[in-house]
Amino acid sequence: MFDMPNDQKIPRNNGNAEVDGGIGVDWGKTSRDYAEHRPGPPLSFYQRLAALEIGLPGQTVLDLGTGTGVIARQMARQGCKVWATDISDTQVKMAQTLATEENLDITFATASAETTKFADHRFDVITAHQCFLYFDLDKALPAILKMLKPNGVLVISHFSWLPLICDIAKASEQLILRHNPKWQAHSYSGRTYPNYPGMHPQFHYSGYFYYDVETPFTRESWRGRIRASRGVGASMNAAEIAAFDAAHAEMLETMTEGDFTVTHRIDAHIFSAGSVEN
């Protein structure tokens, strides 16, 4: 199970309207910072997936909630045939731009996880990175099940800083809360284990891993990473973001001497289509 901050559990129907007290979350507002400053998982993450025969050349992959296409682009680099969707048209346009710059052949579309439709049994792999909590599971999981091949897999993954271990992450979270007290995605304990809630009975666990990495940042890139978070860029207005960012810059001047690392935890929950008896 992915341990939701503040003991929240993943609801069966959780749209953006229900997040952070309904303040409104628009990831499209973060696209520039997201693309420039929000790092994806390191190559070791994809190597671990490859050891489980996920992300191999020639596999068909659908990346749901693709954002700026971090997972989709790496899968394409590895020789997969990739499709990717996101509910935000702004994010999709940024993802397409970044893929085009690398001459990567990825088919992008603007669609929610619940309304993404392809032919039955189309994909070897469907990925959902940092986005599964936003899905309406009653609608998304049956759709995912239909799109997966009989031996296909769903990969739910996260790449989260650890504020209880890293003082910089903790201080940044405290500052976010002073500017946006409704933000709920704070104080992640790092707790994770293979018992993901709310899954469809026609999925069963076929793999799971987690590990920690030290992710390098500069003051500027960490400011950008925090601006690209839900509690700042996706929910504050321009004036609020500017005020927060100025305070954040001042805080980092006193806490850091330049380059630093932030401890992150990576976890991946891998589900195969079909009940465990099959």
Predicted feature locations:
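Residues lining the SAM
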Residues: 128-129, 157
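Conserved Class I S-adenosyl-L-methionine
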Residues: 194-278
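A short, conserved alpha-helix within the catalytic core of class I
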Residues: 135-144
